[in-house]
């Protein structure tokens, strides 16, 4: 299926582009300030999604191609199952084993006109995608890529500056602060001089205790999957993720970080559901704040994303900590 996608305003809010008339299935999520002039989302099922961070600039003529890979490892790449079982008119999700159904675009990314972004690609903060590029592999933060297939031709800044920007995370500042300092951003040296010192994150005793427990389990060979459930979403990706861990018998733990803004009645019902699991290894953390994510995610083996904007925030932390990123609707 192909739909046109556009979000040309610069609002300081999270915006979603839906792929259905009922506005229950999200195709694109944009963070604060980001805009998408015009493009197309070509997708193989309702699982498919594009996650865009904050203050990213996406030009016109963009193609997002997600969930449309055919199985090249079988005797034929022809979609026999879809044809013989009459699934073609149902927007069938083709071959989950060979598709990655989310694109993640970081913060402060600039994507030039007529670029094509393939499913499963993760574009790092500050990257520049040249006009007409075909991006089939991940793009590092602040890299400039061009061509088909897209290749890195340079980086916007030296390694030390990129590391500093990744720690600074100016895109997470309050809009008022960004507005007041944007003239300084025009002069990179002045900007670096003013904000060179980045405050050290203070870790609470609660976080330290949690870190120690996680480290003990990891020493015993356990793998941790970090997940913020989309409890207020109509799509309920959290149900799919929980089902993957409901009956695991190997050393895998789903660490569930409850969003701080969830209504208390929803939290209570979710907690009761977690407690009802007789098998599986699920851990529920109920005091989720930004600092908690920052001190816990670096200890994880994986994070699991949804279609919600908070997945962009945790993916950013995971990228800096070199933690692998999985999409909740993909097979893993």
Tell where the protein language model's regions lie, with residue ranges:
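Catalytic binding pocket for nucleotide-activated donors in carbohydrate/polymer assembly enzymes
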Residues: 139-151, 155-168, 267-272, 302-332
